[in-house]
Amino acid sequence: MVADWNAALARARAHAPFLALALQRRPELAALLAEGLDEAALAAARAEGAGIEDTGLALRRERLSLALVLAVGDLAGAFPLARVMAELTGFADRALDAAMRAVVQRRCPDAPFAGFSAIALGKQGAGER
């Protein structure tokens, strides 16, 4: 199946208010998707929060961009469910790691981050095989 990016973008704008707003906020991602550059759009979405010191803001920006690219990719028929779930799992893992690092840094600014363990279900567990 060949991905129909323009039709997917049109459907997203017409029928999904969240995606329509995300497309307005991230026109560079919309342009990449319109050109069928799905891997470049995914890479840009993953990097959206890089360099932002505020962890919450960085995670919100990445989440918005990743949700946009994955949803339009799904509508276009470009991303199988396993790929979407793997990307969501990867983001959940990065978000949990960043949040824990920020909390430890805030509570113990002079202590090195020694890591943590988590038992997770839901999006975290989607990577199971």
Q: Where in the sequence are the language-model features?
A:
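Non-catalytic regulatory/linker segments of enzymes
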Residues: M1-R129
